[in-house]
Amino acid sequence: MSSPQPPNVPRSETAALPADLAALRAADLPVHGGRTMAYVYDAGIAGLDELAAGAHAAFAGVNGLDMTVFPSVVTLENEVVGRAAALLGGGERTAGTFTSGGTESCLLAVLTAREHAHRTRGVRRPEIVLPVTAHAAFHKAAHLFGLTVVTVPVHPRTFRVAASDLAAALTDDTALAVVSAPSYAHGVIDPVAEVAAAAATRGVLCHVDACIGGWYLGHRRLAADIPPPPAFDLAVPGVTSLSVDLHKYGYTPKGASVLLFRDAELRRHGWFAHASWPGYPVVNTTLQGTKSAGPLAAAWAVLREVGTAGYTELSRRVHLATRQLIEGIGRIEGLRVLGAPDASLVAVASDDPDLDPFVVADEMRSRGWYLQPQPAFAGSPPNLHLTVTAAVAAPERIAELLAELGAATIRARALGPTGVDPAVVALAAALDPDTLGPHEVAAALELAGVSADGALPARMAPVLAVLQALPPRLTERLLPELLGRLYALS
């Protein structure tokens, strides 16, 4: 008997699809080459993308929802999590979970802490204590899971929290203390050991957010000829969980992070199980249900390919390039590095009132470099964020970047700073974000330089200047409206 033939399903013309996708990508910033100094991470290793893409494609249809049907998911995840645990101070009792990214890892850390505080200490009104420099993902987690955020100021020059200040903010209702290794905005490592010890004294969990730098820092300390970073991982007494993204300095495709716990019992508090319905029994280790195993397989393949020796050398190069960059910025008139970065993230501010860092960013973008603007907040002046990755970690590439940056400052100084009409600031200060209607929102966006269709101008300095002048709560009200204009069907 012949095999049944598949039905003749009508298909659209496929020949043009690759060209259509390429046309869409043409408007994006490049993801290779190191010129996009935020959001993307490039190892600069030939063939690595193709290896990852092949692994991703092989497992794209595998559903991580049910590991009894797809046991390969268990093997892959255990090996990836085990690799992270071995690097970052894990021991025999360490457990972990593979997640879709840093935000999900942070969300799960907070959820786990909330459940742990409720079940073990009877906490009904949980709080999360963190430095003002902690990542926004923790504020998102507190919003979603009903925790009160207690922020602690940082030193105005080092941008590092004082352990005594954070310890003083801990109460009987604290479910979680958070420290960064490093902080995203300034690249500094908080006093992990001191904060973890203070938290342990009160029976409070302590999470280390090493999402952006953990993989780099862990391998950097394996390099023999460069200084190791301060202690920051699970080997530090009192640290109960740690998040590390593989799609950052692990250079894997997007959608790969690991959340480590001191033990499996703590991890269990963040899992969800449900059998009180007529369908299949559900157990979720992450916030997702159905999830493709593609990102997991791609991460597994890249970690195997690069290996410990490869990552150690990449981290060594990134460290040396970062030091070269910091020293070079110190020689550019009008620019200064904020704090003393412990990792590969550098925040560059202006000490010249005639030099606007946001105008510098526009000038750099016109030359093919993206430096991420960071508005002034809580004592941190307006600045530009630079993430140094392996693709730009060569002396000649850093020299090229410094030359472009020096030239951009000259042009930006000639253009002058972007001003904001004081009347606009006064008007904004009088607005109540909670009562703004559609017309007021539209007017506020127009004041910020955003058109009715959500299109942004080529030069963003004027928009950033206005947003920086607005109260943060008003900005938080306007940003979703802006996205609503962009993500619209008509």
Model-derived segments and their meaning:
Residues 1-34, 38-67, 71-74, 78, ...:
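Non-catalytic terminal extensions of PLP-dependent enzymes
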Residues 47, 100-285:
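Conserved PLP-enzyme active-site core in the AAT-like
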Residues 69-73, 96-103, 130-131, 376:
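Active-site nucleophile and cofactor-binding loops and adjacent substrate-binding regions
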Residues 84-108:
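Short loop-beta-helix segment that forms the pyridoxal 5′-phosphate
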Residues 86, 111-115, 300-305:
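Short glycine/serine- and small hydrophobic-enriched flexible loop segments
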Residues 92-93, 339-345, 377-383:
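Short Gly/Ser/Thr- and Asp/Glu-enriched loop/turn motifs at secondary-structure junctions
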Residues 194-197, 201, 324, 359, ...:
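Alpha-helical scaffolding segments of alpha/beta enzyme cores, especially the outer helices
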Residues 227-344, 348-353:
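Active-site C-terminal subdomain of aminotransferase-like
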